[in-house]
Amino acid sequence: MILIDGKKIAAELRQELKKEVSDLKAKYNKVPGLTVILIGDMTPSQIYVRNKEKSAIEVGLKSDVIKYPDTVEEKVILDKIHDLNKDDAVSGILVQLPLPKHIDKKKVIEKIDPSKDVDGFHPMNVGNLSSGYESSVPCTPLGCYLLIKKMEPNLNGKKAVIIGRSNLNGKPMAQLLLKENCTVTITHSRTKDLKAECLEADIIVAAVGIPELVKGDWVKKDTIVIDVGINKTDKGLSLIHI
């Protein structure tokens, strides 16, 4: 078994992005800017945003985090997004999810200019990805895709099994692999004999948040296995158990 070193690959990618940002600055005398809207004080969201800000600064982007209490009115958020859409200094907008219950996630996502939609959640970007057109792609499936391509550049004809059908991970992951001419099967909680599906796969991406879901005897030799997310168990932090 070969362990995929995601941290190493991510570091290499950040170096590539750093050069791209430097080239953009030299050519246009302008640095792309990322603005993140963070609502509330949920610890996981704060960690995610802090890591995003750190990575943005590392590659040379301008980074701005706008924080609101979880009591903020929905209109305040929508008005701020409206202003950011019109701000030429802002290249990308990201609203950290989840949102407080009184704020309509759909309204917030649809308010973001599709060309500045970093998460790729806007219906226009979702539709473009499904249609094979250029679009913003959700970051997590895009990261998984880049890891897979690093391990196997030629995915033509590979059989891929996606465990999970969420709009955030499963569905966009399937679209990315379909564009590479993979034969893609999306599985979920109602799938019969998940083990049999996995045993036929050249690529398995688990995106359901269940620790140790994919067992060692579910995976054939040389299969690429990616687990989306980290789960906390009695044994500590856990990835897929293989």
Residue ranges and their predicted role:
Residues M1-Y28:
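Positively charged, low-complexity intrinsically disordered leader regions
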Residues L34, A56-D70, V184-T185:
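Short beta-strand elements in bilobed, periplasmic/extracellular small-molecule ligand-binding domains
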Residues G40, D64-E74, S189-R190:
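Short beta->alpha junction loops
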Residues P44-E53, P138-V214, W218, I224:
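Glycine-rich phosphate/diphosphate-binding loop of Rossmann-like nucleotide-binding domains
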Residues V76-D88:
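Short, well-structured alpha-helical segments in soluble
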Residues A89-L99, D104-K107, A201-D234:
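Glycine-rich phosphate-binding loop
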Residues V95-N156, M173:
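Anion-binding alpha/beta catalytic cores of soluble intermediary-metabolism enzymes, centered on
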Residues I240-I242:
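Conserved small/polar residues in nucleotide/adenosyl-binding loops
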